[in-house]
Amino acid sequence: MKNLFSKALLLVGALFMLHTGVSAQDMPLPVDANVRIGKLPNGLTYYIRHNEKPKGQADFYIAQKVGSILEEDNQRGLAHFLEHMCFNGTENFPGNKIVSWLESKGVKFGQNLNAYTSIDETVYNISNVPIADVAVQDSCLLILHDWANALLLEDEEIDKERGVIHQEWRSRNVGQMRILENVLPTMYPDSRYGYRMPIGTMEVVDNFPYKALRDYYEAWYRPDQQGIVVVGDIDVDRIEAKIKEMFSHIEMPANAPERVYYPVADNEGTIFAIGADKEQSYPIIQMSFKTEAFPNEMKGNMSYLVQKYVMGMITDMLDNRFSDIANKPDAPFAQAGTIYGEYFVAKTKSALSFSGVAKDYDLVPVLQALYREALRAQQHGFTVGEYERAKNEYMSRLERAYNNRNDRENGQYVQEYVRHFIDNEPIPSIEDEYQLMQMIVPVLKVEMINQVLPQLITENNRVILAMLPEKEGFAIPTQEEFAQAMAAVEAETLEAYVDEVKAEPLIPNLPAPGKIVAEKALDQWGATELTLSNGVKVIVKPTQFKADEILFSATGNKGTALLSADNNTDIKNLDVVLSSNGLGTYTEIDLQKYLSGKQASVGLTIGNTSTELSGQSTPKDLPTLMELLYMTMTDVTITEDEFKSLQSKFAGILRNQESNPQYLFSRDAMKSLFENPRSIPITSADVEAANRENILNIVHSMTANAADYKFVFVGNIDMATFRPLVEQYIATLPADAKNIATEQINDPSMQVRNGKINDTYTAKMETPQTTVIIMASGNMEYTPKNVQVASVTGQILSKRLLDTVREDMGAVYSIGAACRMTRDAGKNATLVTQFPMKPEMKQEVLDFIAAEIDRMKGNVTQEEINTVIEFMVKSANEAKEKNGSWLNAISGWTVNGVDIFNGNVETLESITIDDVQKFLTDLMAQGNYAIVIQDPEVAAAE
């Protein structure tokens, strides 16, 4: 089949050449000169870059062009199994030594040490490693070496891991996954892609012979398929020499199998892949138009950059149209979107895909709406106004990245180099990319963009994927019904899209500016407190952490605890409304159009005991941030049509979730743990009963008095610019300093119930598993040290549970614990663990956890404390270089008067065994211990 899409893009490229005199087809993209790329004689590739964000740390990755697509039928699951085994013993790090050694250096398993396996790749990472000691650098490279070529793959460890992976399958074998397993063969006829989900089959996982895994490792983990990436505060020459020393001796295996990239065939007409499952949470449909993937060998040319930009514009503009439709009461979908990229799970085929989630159950009108807008864009194209907004938004984001070019963290570079190694994605410097796009974007007019879709949206190479909840009384649409629905849309006469843009100002009547009447230095924060003429106080901390970032928050003492029980339904709907509200005469869609090309946003959250505004902007867009802040405090709105649309959207989504075991457990658990009915998750009935006027009244009552709020700004702030903006937009807010809300730090009805709780619920589920929540709670003194001791306690317990319940018992895939403190009076400390598990081992695991908590009261080791504190000190030092950390710390201090940020490293280093044991003993002595369980429902015997 001819690739008409490629021809359309070549036409765009030709037009680009006419305007610039440059051939996009042939002009190579420059590679960032600051990354050193090399290849060893054995075929192994490496990328090394010096970067000091964060200072004194580095990331070490090994990427493998190996995934589940390479498995034979009797090997399904081995690629993923092998990834697990990389943490269970190597020649230089036997047993659990990789994890234990790295954690002793402040590298936390799961957070800084991890891996993933997909269909075409497997990637391992050791991130945020403190590397002041060069021996640590060498040891991290040695770990990568062992992963590449020196796994032990011991019989006993393989057998232990079978149970872990079986539990991972159990926890992930939800409705959507089961549907995918069933429909992928239809989506990929006569292709391996139809049968190669990475988890594999449990028949293989439970029974493969040890030699099969070792043979797979020998065949595929080899230098020509491996890439090493090291980015951080390192000596590039030294790391390169070490890579050559450690990895050059690795030999290619004899008779190595060819690494095949399996093609995906074109199809005449339309493929329909339809599946249903009782536990599918919502009905979703995806309409894909397949096309050839851009050749990897050509991605280094300008033509690829042009293609990415063009398709990005198309998907952005279509997404904006879908958002507009979704906000109408008669919209058939709750949400819809567009994506261009890999055809579902295959790298060797691309697709333009439209997807939508039905409000209730019927996917036929959703498919019609998606197809209708695709054809409208195909036939009439996009308007100049739409393209200008999308283009401005793109250039605004690119400009922000350019301005932050000296503040990029290691992880951003690593991800780019991994993608370059695996997919040959281009890696120009941000300076080069910014310069190139400033040249390309003005030349590409909307008329050029509009020539692409007519070639891509055709009657062939179409794939319809439908996934539905299986419900009694609801028929699953047939292939014929979907085909007829599409034919009906094709018969329609479609009008061009009308682009409506509001011209009036966001703030129609801006008051005369107020004044800054006093300034006070807050030395402990390196900040200044401004007192305004309306009595409001603003704290500002200028920083140089990021050139193009300003963050703000404002916390008020009012919350829903002030409201009577007859407001319960509307209180539950606050988050629904505040997810899609407008401001003044601007609807949510009007705001999206107004903000295109501006990097500024503000959100509002109303909690039980407080209300918070939060937002961000660039220095250039700080005036827009201030506009949004002013309007959020004074005039949050939602039209009747928008409200009805939200109701139908969320009510439908919730109705479909109400048979999902996870949703049912969240509802049941909250009933068991808390007394207040407001704690129970929102239902479809709650949404349908909501009152728009009352919700808006609640919102306005919470933001009516700006003097209730503590405003904090952190970032690259120029005070000469900042002061007049504060006087215009914050000093003019309605405020009454004589009637500030009383601080609400105690709402007993929202606290965990007293005493012992042991509740068990059951639910029907296709894949039986037990889910457990264990929570101990109590009242502890809120001090900076206790906050840190609580965290240390939770992390030590988490590590013990992981080592025993997962690694030794094989009862879970994932388990952890957390211990936290809040400023609330009453039960302000909680120790929580939640996990899904093998039902047969429930009592054994519960008994172990209870006994382990009891043991911890008297046998915490110094080694455990040192390991946790090493990680926490590293994290604390990282936080000192982040605007968000300072914002949270200052905001917390303004609310509760306790500084847990400054001096936190010294506090951590002072924690002793006695501190942890006493904290846990005092917490458990209060006798509040809850166990809430969901078991699979057992069918009654006939």
In which residue ranges do the predicted regions lie?
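M16 family metallopeptidases and their MPP-like homologs
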Residues: 49, 54-71, 78-79, 96-146, ...
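Peptidyl-prolyl cis-trans isomerase
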Residues: 101, 150-153, 157-158, 444-448, ...
